[in-house]
Each structure stands twice: as structure tokens, then as C-alpha cells.
Amino acid sequence: MATILTDKKAVVLKLKEPSRVTTVIPTAKIVKHNGATLVAVPHRPDETRVLRQLGFKDIPDPLKTHYKFPLAGGKFDPFEAQVETANFFSMNNRCFCTNSMGLGKTVSALYAFDYMKKSKLINKALVICPLSTMERTWADEIFKTFPHLDSAIVYGSRSRRLKMLKEDVDIYIVNTDGIKVIQEALSDRHDINLVIVDEVAMFRNTNERWKSLNEILNKQKPTRRVWALTGAPCPNEPTDAWAQCRVITPASKEVPKYFSQFRDTVMKQISQFKWIAKKDAMDIVHRTMQPSIRYALDDCVDLPPQIIINRDAELTPEQVKAYRDMMSKLSMEYAGGQVLAVNEAVKANKLIQIACGVAYGSNGEEIVLPNKPRIDVLTELVEESEGKVLVFVPLTAVLTNVADELSKKWSVRTVHGGTSKTERDEIFSGFQSDHEPHIIVANPGTMSHGLTLTKGTTIVWYAPIYSNDIYEQACARVRRPGQTKTTVIAHIAASEVERNIYKRLATKQKMQGLLLDLMKEGEIH
């Protein structure tokens, strides 16, 4: 029988043979109490795992016993799914978390890190994540929920990345494509003993990016703890799981050494170049991708009806140039008193157009700018979503391009001012009743009051709109009677103007004065 001393954070055992524990747990100590010989073991995850293997099944989870969870975002108690996920991370050195988008995989991993650091089992962490989540997701969550932790964004030129990696902080955040630059420098960083791989499905192919991660996780310091996060482990085929498992849990007996072995297990060849998934493919993926934890939105009864998430997109060089040119023009107009409350929405919209891939020449001609990073972020969000998706694109000039890109992988229909009522009715009926379309790409102004699209569980705003009423009505399309699931509202932004518009939309603040305030404060960029 084990006794937990919460003030000492220790497990006390009365054993006939203390050596049974002391020989396998170096931190265990023999103590005398009232003439009895007892064994005291630190009540931490590593020791608890060994004790359970020895047969002491009644040892409670250390994190849930001792950790005082900070308020998420400084405001909210963690959901049950977040507590259980954090606890799961703490009890597994290498594992997967495939919780649905919006359930707080980020904060769960940070809760576990915070606890493990306080327990002196982890020193520093490296977070590898998409560029879109570096600042708006990871850095923001650390700042709001864990103000006692320091972080560094390892991004920029090679010299800047290496400089940031030398900073004495608790958590280093690097984008997925930046790990090769710091790969060699990490070989000497034994203090970084946890790696969190966010959106691990981006490593579903054994390319150069995968090889860099494999070097960091399995060759430099195989004892590093590794927690892998993704809401969609197999966005294309069941075979997507193989490379992820080979890099995260290579020692698992469930993971075949060669891709062809795994492919033959989950896929059936029907012609020389065509394979289809077997009926039990996803069951095999689940068995292979272990240890893992998953909560779906439907599993969580303590969630709010809507969850808002923010994703950053990078501007292409062509967009950066056009954006700077427009900013120079606006700055001169502002200095000359030409930016007024009555025209600021039009001027702000020009910046949003550029961020979405459209500019206009001196004669008013439309110029299409490369915007792949924003499309990539949108694709990531659709892959992570559960159920059907509404994508709102306020700019008609961009809407067709967005739909064309998405239609490469999913069934897509578009709704805009030129869509007839008959066609709209057909699209909405199919969305609600049929398997297709999977995605509706729409101008938000065309989504009328009273329209019900409850088969959709995710709304993605490709860009913000300068109207509280249209934003609120568009978001309400999926929050209607008959909606039984928590819905996710995702905002994509590439500029401070967009982020501030979203902030005001989410809190129902008036839009008037937004651009003027930003220019006055010198924060617009």
C-alpha cells in the first residue's frame, strides 16, 4: 500500500524487500519511521512509471496530484481534455497527441512542460511548428498563460537564428523549415531535453526536412523527450503515418522498418500505379501510432459553443514590396491629413488586398501577386478540421483563386454576388444533405440572415472584413439550431492591420478609427 505525502511530493512504501525498489529507482531512499523501515520515492512521472511496472498500480498521476494549473490565457480554467492531455504528455517520453483543432494541444503541452520543469525532469524545450503558429499560437500562449517562462522566436537569417538559440530562455520556437539551420548547433545543447513537434504530419515524407528532424531526435540525443502534435495525422493516405512514427517512436515494435512493409499492411494495390486503403487501415494506423491520446470535439462536454483560433501567414517578397509601396503612400496621405474616418476602410482594404495576393496598377489594372504561404495556412486548417468547412473570402478578385487551390484536394463550390439563387440553393442543400461539397468558398456578404449550414464545423476567414454585422452573421451560419458540435472560427492574418480588425470583430468593437489609431501609434506594418 502506497502513501502519498503531498507536502513532500513523495510516495512512501512499506516493503519487506526495499531493494526491489531501490535497485531500479536511483532516487528512492530508505527511511526509518517509528521503528519501521520505509522506502520514499519522489512522486514524479518517471518514478511513478517504474513503480507501476513493478506492480504498484495504485500510484496516482503526479501531475494531477501536485500541479496547480495556471488559467489558460490568464482567464480560464483548463478543460478536462487539456488536463488529461497534459497528464498524458507527462507520463510518456515519446508520444502522439491527435486532439481535434481547437482543443488546446498547445496549452496542454505547455502545462506538461511547466510541470516537468518544476519537477526538475526537463530543463529547456524546443518547439518545432509551422510558421503560421510561431507567434500567434505558441509565443502568445506562453506570454498569456505562463508569464514566468521565457521564450525565443528562432527565425530570420542564419546568424539571427543561431544568435537566438544562444539566448538563455526556457522555450525555443523554430519554424518547421528552419530546423536544418540550427541542426548542428543543437548537437551541443544537452540542456534542451524536450522537443515538441507541432503539426508532425508535415513530416509525413522522408525528405530533407524529415532527415534533419531525425538527426535531432534520434541521433544527437536519443534520450530527448518528444511530444508530437497533429489534429490530422493522415491528411492524404494511411501511409502518411509511417514516416511520422519512424521519427517519433522508431523503437516501437509496431513500426515497420521499411515503408513498403507498412504500405502493404494498410493499402491494397489495384493496378500498377494505384493503391487504395484497406478497410482496417485506420485501425492499423492507430495501433502503430502509439502511445497516443485523442479527444474529438464531440468528446468534450465542457467546451464553449465556439472556439476562435488565429494563424499567421507570411508575405511573399512581391507582397512585401507592394505592401511597403502602399504604406509609403498612406503615410504621406496621413501626414497630409488625407486619411480620414470616412475613407479609412477603403484604404485599409487596399492593404488587405495586397496581403491576399491582389494589387492594382496606376491605371487600375488588377495585378496578381504570389500568395502561396497564405494558401498553405488555409490548407493546413482544412486538413485539421473535423467535418465540412466554410471559407470566407471578402475579396471577389481572390475568391476564385482560393477555390481553385482547394479544389486540388477537396470538393469545392463557390458562392458570390454572381451566383444565382437556384445555384445557391443547390449548393447549400448539397452541403447540408450530401457528401459534397466538402468546402464552400464564399463572399461573406452573400451569406444571408437565416441561412443554416450546420454540417459545417469550421469557418476560416481568409481575410477580415470591415463590418461587425456581416462578420457576426457569417459566423452564425454554423451556430444554428441543430448544431450539436463545438465549432471553430479560424482567422488568417499577415499584417497588424488584419490582426487588429480581427481583434475588434471578436470583441464587437467599432471599426471606425482603427487605421487612424494604428498610424498615429506607428504600429502599422
Each language-model region and where it sits:
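Conserved P-loop NTPase motor "coupling/switch" region that bridges the ATPase
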Residues: I122-K124, S151, E167, L194, ...
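A conserved SF2-helicase RecA2
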Residues: Y466-H525
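SF2 helicase motor core recognition
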Residues: K180-A185, N236-P238, V398-A403, R424-F428, ...
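Conserved pre-motif I regulatory segment
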Residues: P62-T98
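Conserved helix-turn-beta segment of the N-terminal RecA-like "Helicase ATP-binding" lobe
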Residues: T133-S157, I248-A251
